[in-house]
């Protein structure tokens, strides 16, 4: 097996072990079998299952659907950076990326109830968000809701605007993406095959205040 393939397999096994999806003998655990019920990356499935305990499945399913989309939610708008930042300001949340993404999805859901195709397209254009990503996320969310119903999970369970239940659920699955603020202003990823130093950016974090920790989310 090529060296790169060995690394990929090793990384995948390590992720499953950190999630408690496999035991020390690499056998699938009961939790791992539960993860396998969802057509998701294991870390996202873990977040969905954790959301049941914290009462925020509706929010986690929406966020996971967006994270699973093949298109970025915020397309490159370098030629209109100032306009894009101003338009997206209304969605920003102090807790970071994931709540910001949820705010966008919630706003789009409201638009979908009152606007036709042209109105939805215009809303996305004015707010510099990718409609393709949102439409794909809608389809993924519908599929995930169906899985939840089949396995007896109430996907409508909501935490409203409470931050902690959602963040705790996401942390259950995204442990490898957690980073801590260092004295020099960089962030050190706390898990992974090697220590990584990360620099936050306004576009990435969509936050004005530096947090002592953050969980990265791809846009």
Predicted regions and their residues:
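Second RecA-like catalytic domain
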Residues: 1-219
């Amino acid at each position: 097996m090529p060296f790169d393939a060995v690394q990929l397999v090793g990384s995948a096994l390590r992720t499953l072990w950190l999630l408690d999806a496999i035991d020390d003998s690499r056998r699938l655990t009961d939790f791992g079998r539960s993860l396998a019920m969802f057509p998701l990356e294991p870390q996202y499935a873990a977040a969905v299952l954790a959301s049941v305990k914290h009462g925020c499945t509706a929010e986690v399913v929406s966020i996971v659907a967006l994270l699973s989309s093949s298109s970025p939610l915020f397309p490159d708008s370098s030629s209109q950076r100032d306009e894009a930042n101003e338009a997206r300001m209304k969605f920003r949340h102090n807790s970071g990326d994931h709540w910001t993404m949820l705010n966008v999805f919630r706003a789009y859901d409201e638009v979908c109830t009152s606007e036709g195709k042209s109105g939805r397209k215009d809303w996305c254009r004015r707010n510099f968000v990718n409609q393709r990503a949102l439409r794909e996320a809608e389809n993924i969310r519908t599929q995930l809701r169906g899985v939840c119903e089949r396995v007896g999970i109430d996907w409508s369970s909501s935490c409203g605007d409470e931050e902690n239940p959602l963040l705790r659920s996401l942390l259950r699955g995204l442990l490898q993406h957690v980073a801590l603020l260092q004295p020099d202003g960089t962030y050190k990823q706390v898990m992974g095959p090697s220590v990584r130093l990360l620099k936050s950016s306004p576009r990435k974090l969509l936050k004005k205040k530096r947090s002592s920790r953050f969980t990265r989310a791809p846009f």
